[in-house]
Each structure stands twice: as C-alpha cells, then as structure tokens.
Amino acid sequence: MKRLSHLTRTGEARMVDVSAKPVLLREAIAIGEIRLQPATLKLIESNAIAKGNVLATARLAGILAAKKTGELIPLCHPLPITHCEVSFEIPARRDRVVITASAKIAAQTGVEMEALTAVTIAALTIYDMCKAVDKTMVISDVRLLKKTKLAR
C-alpha cells in the first residue's frame, strides 16, 4: 500500500514539501448538489428569499472559499489561484441545484482542494440562506470531476 505523503514514517502529520516539483499549469473541476423543495427553488429564482440573492451570494462565497482553502484545511498549501468559477444548474426535476466549480493555477501542487472547497461552501451558503423556508435540504455528492496538469 502506498504511504500517505502528508504523514511522516511515524504517523505524524506534516505539510508536504513541494519545493522541488516543477511549476505546472493545473486545473481542477469539482461538482456537488443540494437537494431542496421545488417551492424553495421558486423562491430562489424569483429572488424572494429574505436574505437576498441566493445564487449570487453562493457564487461569491464559493470563490472566496477557494481563495481561503489554505487557511481552512491545515495541511493544504496556501495557493495564489489564478482563476475560479462557480456555476449552478437546476435540472428538469427541479428538486436540486447542481454546483460546479473550477479552479486554475500555475504552481507546484494541485488545485483540487480549492475546487472542492468552492463547491462545498457554495452549497452551505445556499443552505444557510434557505434554511428558514426549507428544513429538508441535503448537501450531497461533492466530488472531484477532473484534475489536469500541463507543462508551461
């Protein structure tokens, strides 16, 4: 079994040293969803949630979270991401919001934690803004869709 890179041989947590790795262009795409009542979606779409524009706020929260990932996850490297995008899709069933986030960087380590954090915080923001009208919401299926690295 492969040894985890963030643990020492004695099992202590450490930040991985990436200084010898080459700087590469890297991108990650993550996805997740929040299930909610169709009536809640109508309120979101008509901008009738008391706390304000839900999707605009969730988009900004996701982007901000991606930028702060290194402060939130103890062994995650603080990265100067060069691009982050958060988008939303409402499927025909109208019982969920699908959240997709992409992040890009030119660095010595990947940017997947930033994309995953963006999706998660966007979903939590939707939850927070809608919890007064919907007690059934469920955040689920947050996962990495794609991770790429290209030579500069």
Question: What is each residue range found by the language model?
Answer:
Residues 1-55, 60-152:
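C-terminal binding/interaction regions
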